[in-house]
Amino acid sequence: MSPDRLMIARRYLDDARSLLLAGRLESAVSRAYYAAYQAMWAALGNPPKGEQWRHIGINSHFVRGRWFEPAYPQTGPGLLEHLRFSLHRLYQFRVDADYDLTPINTKSAEECVRTAERTIAEIEQRV
């Protein structure tokens, strides 16, 4: 567990909320994504030596739940399976906003902020 990364994740989440309120929806989505990403990294710790956390891969490792239940099997559904789809959507919205320059609507931006909030809350419950 990395308290510094979790602190950064919370800060990014605050930024996402502020951007959402200001109507800067694409930026809110991007900050929400990185809030969740940094929170997952905080929970998982650093990747194995010589590797790095890939954006889609970190979701799978996080959802598996072995970061808080190390004896949990490596196959079958993860302990945080209820977050998998939302995290994938958050990633896709971020790609849409940052790379494809797709306009994001308020409902989608709110969904992204909620996903980041839920991700951080799941971690805070377990640390």
What is the role of each PLM region?
Residues 1-127:
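Terminal alpha-helical segments
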